[in-house]
Amino acid sequence: MSARLKVVYDGMHYMIVYKSAGVLSQPGLASDSRPVLMSELRGLLSETLDLYSVQRLDACVTGGTVVAKNKRAAMMFSRYLKQGGGSGYGLTRRYLARINAQPVCDEGTIESPGMVTYYRRVRDDCVVVELKTGKKHQIRKHLALNLNCPIVNDTYYGGSVVKGVNGQIALHSAFVRTRIGKNMQDHLVGIEPQEQTLWKSILTENGMLPDDIVRTLTRDKLF
């Protein structure tokens, strides 16, 4: 696979693709020459697949993103994201974020018009975040503007600068849980070696997510 993309799971209905920083989830302006996820993916896979983007990550965000492998799967994921409950194919999206301040509360729900985010602190400067809705910049806005805890290297929302790291913020799509019928499947997505600079204070010596953070990411409910 490309150094920018890596298929970490390939199933019947969907795949999980690791997206590196600098890759767009959807085409930008005509003048934007950065690679686009779906175009890159179609160019890399040998077989011709009917692929649909389900989960969109900002270009500066790393980690796992869900790609449906047929139109029906895309429709079923979309139905769940719009209606929730038992409709469609269930999808839980959890992220790891390093932040510039410690939240006042260890866990909670952040709400603003049309947006709901859950969070749980796992380190003084690190939280696990779960999306209920998925609006543009939702996590970045909620952490910075509602919790006063901007994400490290996210200068757009007031985060501190990490020298030598450009085009990447300390926000990583680390866990995806799907439910298709009675089948529930968990996908833990680590941080690739070339993108670990922002995470060195969190990761183990081997560059892995530590056990306590994995337990929080994979628990049934965040709180």
Swiss-Prot record:
Its EC number is 5.4.99.43. Signal peptide: none annotated. CDD domains: PseudoU_synth_RluA_like. The active site is at residue 58. Its main location: mitochondrion. GO terms for cellular component: mitochondrion. Pseudouridylate synthase responsible for the pseudouridine-2819 formation in mitochondrial 21S rRNA. May modulate the efficiency or the fidelity of the mitochondrial translation machinery. This is 21S rRNA pseudouridine(2819) synthase.
